[in-house]
Structure formats: C-alpha cells, structure tokens
Amino acid sequence: MERDFMPPVIATESHLMSVKSDSPLIAKTRVVLSGSVDAANAVAAYYAEHDCDVTNDDNGAKISLSVGHLILRPGEKHLDIEVGSKSEAGVAQMKAALIAILQSIVPEADLDCRWKGAGESNGKLPNFRELRVIGVTDLSSHMRRLRLAGDDLEFYDGDGIHMRLLIPPRGVVEPQWPTLAPNGMVIWPEGENAVAPRVYTIRRIDATAGWIEVDFVMHGDNGPGSAFALNAQPGDRIGMTGPLGGELPDADWFLFAGDETALPAIGRYLEE
C-alpha cells in the first residue's frame, strides 16, 4: 500500500525490543544552547503529546518509548541527553528522532554534537536493507506483488508488519541511500538522487530464504510506489528501513475495514 511519507519521529517499533539482549545500549551527548530547561520541557511535551510516558523530576525528564528510553538533563547553557535501547537500530532511531525534534522546536540549539557510547556513527543506518526484485506477480488488474530479496531479514520477521520502502528515481542503476551524520541525524540524498520514502506492509516474509513480498496498488505512474511496481524487472534495487509496528493489541475480536491499500495488512492479520 502506498502512503504519504511519515518521518521517523515517534515510531512504535516494538519489534526492536524483542530481538536483542536484556542489557540496554546507552549513548550520551551534550547539546549547547541557552534556555536548556525550556528546551527539555518542550521536548518532553512533544513526546507526551505523542502518547509516550514522561516522568519529570528536579533534574529533568525521562521518556519511555517502546524502542527504549530518553533522559534529558538541563544544565547551564547545555542539555545533556542519554538514549538507551536494546538494539543498535533502536539507538540510531532515537538519536535521529531527537535531533530532528530539536531542530524543529529548538532552532537555536547547536546540533553539531557527537555521541559517545553505543552506536557511534559509522555513517550507516543499522536497520537499512538493500533489496532487489526477484519476482513479479499480478494478483488482479489493480494489485501487483513483488518478491524482494535481501540479507539479514530476521530483524524484520516479528510483530512489526510495516516498513518504509526507499524508492530510487526511475532509471537509476546505482541508487544513493541515506546515511547517518556524526550527530545521528539521517542525511537523505537530494536532487536527482533523491529517494521517495513510502510506508508499506510486509505481506509475507521468509527470513531464512531471504525474501519478503509486498503488494502494490496499481494506478499507473501516479506515485513512486506504483511506478516502481509497474516497471519492476528482476534485479531492480530498492531500499528498506523499519520495522514500523502495526501489531494488533490483545482483544477478543477485531473488525477490519479499509480501502484497497489496506488489503495487504488485513490479509496478513487474518492469516496470522
């Protein structure tokens, strides 16, 4: 299913919490800014508005997310920050989200910071996977399924059924993928190399065999996802990040309703 891109600010990636050891990985940094108390309060309020658990004390705030925790400690003209998660991908996600939030709501902050501890930047997104097309199946006149092969897909074989496909420009043989800046922020390719991020559902996955299947609603060239699926040939490359959650809560029964873009998720829920 093709949707508008949703920035990875507050993603409920509960799958990240279940695939690594119980010992959290910790990373710390210091951001230089005046008004650090106001900045910490603004960040904490942002997370609270997105239904995260926020605990305030005399020293700052602790924020609990499905992917880990975030601690804010304001000082004199600086804000000390700690992020903790059970995976390198979780640490990277929280760094990128926090820097993006600070950039948005505290524009005066000096974000030329460096992290110490887990996940020190090597420029790579730990949850990024490059995939290639190995199969094309038309399910109907308006739905096409692509089988995409890649390495290390066990990370995606969990409760989180959604992910983000990074669709390269048409005709680009060697796509440029996003990287991580030293401050943890995601650097996206720009101009003629810009990729189009879109959220999709992993319809099926066989991590051992090394493939996933994704269903695309076909509407010609109107949209990067549909255009990619329409022109897909074996060997074509596409990127993936995530997973993005989508697991069902505990309940006695469910009522599913949606348009054709929701069919892949509904189908997977019914099968599983």
Q: Each PLM stretch: what is its role?
A:
Residues 36-42, 88-95, 153-158:
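Short, conserved charged micro-motifs
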Residues 53-88:
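Short, intrinsically disordered low-complexity segments
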Residues 48-53, 99-107, 167-168:
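A common structural junction motif
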Residues 121-130, 190-198:
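Short coil-to-beta-strand transition motifs
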Residues 93-122, 236-240:
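Short, structured interface segments
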Residues 2-55:
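Short Lys/Arg-enriched alpha/beta "domain-start" segment
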Residues 136-227:
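Ferredoxin-reductase
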Residues 224-272:
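FNR/FR-type flavoprotein reductase catalytic core
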